[in-house]
Amino acid sequence: MKTPKPLALILPLFLLGCRAPEPVAAAAPAPKAHMNMLQLMRAFPFPHSNVLFDTQTRDPIGPEKKQSMTYSVYRWQDSDTYAGWEGVENSALALSEMAPLLLVPRTCANGLPAPVDQADWKAAVEGLVGAGEAAHKAALTKNLDEMLNVSETVVNSCSACHDKYRDVDLSGGTRCEVKAKK
């Protein structure tokens, strides 16, 4: 019996190491903004947060709610497709789901760039995600007191941005302007 030659043992290992490298997946393109910040706010968090706030005074399945809660802003009358507690649950989820869109670079309505790279803005977006998750958990209980309690969480998450970037002196068109700390 012949003893194997070292080359015969090493060659297969060498050939295995000479394979072409695995292709690297291309990075996903950065999301593109199609709305300014005002349009985004009016399209998503405004109507959906109002659905949640509506539960402070109205039962989603009460007789006075004949129209869709989720799209009541648009007057989808006599529709129960998105009504009731399911509409409340969906609106809570919508807040969490859409919150990352607030990090996509875009302009404010006044043409200034939205402060999406600011640490406090990013923290407020995370706060909105958490508020939506908390509201969804409360909506699953179908308990109006739970919805009343979670409303403060939603308000606080919105105020984290509004107090600094929206509710400012508008005489100089300063919405979205990053102010230097005093």
Q: Can you say where each PLM-predicted feature lies in the sequence?
A:
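Extracytoplasmic c-type cytochrome modules immediately beyond a signal peptide or single-pass transmembrane anchor
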Residues: 23-153, 167-182
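The canonical Cys-X-X-Cys-His
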Residues: 154-165
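C-terminal motif of bacterial Sec signal peptides marking the signal peptidase cleavage site
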Residues: 15-17
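Bacterial N-terminal signal peptides that target proteins for export
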Residues: 1-8
